[in-house]
Every structure is written in C-alpha cells, then in structure tokens.
Amino acid sequence: MRPDTSRDPVAGPDSGPEPPFPIRLAGPVIKGFGRGSKELGIPTANIPADGLAEYPDLQVGVYYGVVALNPAQSEVPSTSAQILPAVLSIGYNPFYKNTTRSIEIHIMPPLTAPSPTATGTPGHVTFHKLPDFYGTSLKLLILGYIRPEYDYVSAEALIEDIRVDCEVARRSLQRGAYVRYLGAGADENEENEEVQEQRRWLTTF
C-alpha cells in the first residue's frame, strides 16, 4: 500500500542521469490489458518486455524518460521526428494483480505545452491522449526512477498518484542536464557526445 507521505517534486540528481541510466528499450507498440485508457483514462503505449532481459537488476516501479515514434509508421503528426517526454511503469501493477511483467508508457505533451495534469481533483484528471498507433516502432530512453509500485485503496487514488508522477517527470525533465535529451536547452556544439548519440539512437529507425 502507498505510504501516507508527501511526494518529492523531482526525481534523480540535478547533475543528470546516473548508472544504470540512461536505459534503452525499443519495440513495436502492442495491445496491453486495455485498462489504462478505458478504466483510468490514462492512455499508455505498451512495448514487449523481453528487452528487460538485458537489465536483470532493474526494479519494478515508475520511471521517466523520453520516447520517439517511427515517423514513417506513425499517423500522429505531432510526434513526427519528435522526441517526447514520458512517464512509465515497469512491473505488475499490484492494483490489478497482474502476473505478467509489462512496460506501460504514457507519452506526455512537449514540455513547452501546457501540462494537462498540472491540476485536477480525484476522478476528474485529464491526461494527454494520442490516436492509437499499434504496430508503430517506439524507442524509449529511461532517464530516472520515480517510485516503487504500490497497491491502492481505490482507482481514484491510483489516478491521483499517476497524475503526480506525470508532474514529477515533467519537472525532472525540465532540468538542464535532462532537457537536452529532448533536443532543447543547449546549442548542439555545447552538448556532450553521449547526449547527441542517445538522441541519434532515438530518432534513427
């Protein structure tokens, strides 16, 4: 059960990702359990979990990072050739008692756009939604860990915690050492080679 404590406003050090991050995962967007969007109102893009075999020590929980969709496959114009912020869960979702580990990614709007999850009351939160893009190749770069998985007393409590996760992810990615992975915040000549290489990987399909 989720502890009754206040949430930290950001996750990860201000200096930038530390090992094991960044973590690369990729795969086609597949159908999940269908509950994120239908029951919770939180659209997610699921990718196969077999890529986690390379990271056997990665704990289950909620993470943040950046994603890119193959523009040749995606019919979502706003994502074409873009790297977008994301919050994701890796694990079993104790609230639904899943027995199969999954990777569920919620793609957020660009950091320059207003945040749909900045405010809200339980049960009345609006999350960013894109048209379905099943089968589209997706690349994910995980940059930090937010919190463990928890069980919840209600769906409303789960939704509120995910809303806060989105805001923690946004604030974390707005910091200088992280926003560069989105292609913002610095002149390319001033960026280190590692960040440039990660961005090239994200956008090369």
Swiss-Prot record:
Keywords: ATP-binding, Flavoprotein, FMN, Kinase, Magnesium, Metal-binding, Nucleotide-binding, Transferase, Zinc. InterPro entries: Riboflavin_kinase, Riboflavin_kinase_bac/euk, Riboflavin_kinase_dom_sf. Its cofactor is Zn(2+); Mg(2+). One of its GO terms (molecular function) is riboflavin kinase activity. It comes from the Eukaryota. It catalyses: riboflavin + ATP = FMN + ADP + H(+). GO terms for biological process: FMN biosynthetic process; riboflavin biosynthetic process. Zinc or magnesium. GO terms for cellular component: mitochondrion. Residues 1-24 are annotated as: Disordered. The active site is at 104 (nucleophile). The keyword GTP-binding does not apply. Catalyzes the phosphorylation of riboflavin (vitamin B2) to form flavin mononucleotide (FMN) coenzyme. Belongs to the flavokinase family. This is Riboflavin kinase. It comes from Aspergillus terreus (strain NIH 2624 / FGSC A1156). The lineage of its organism: Eukaryota, Fungi, Dikarya, Ascomycota, Pezizomycotina. The gene is fmn1.
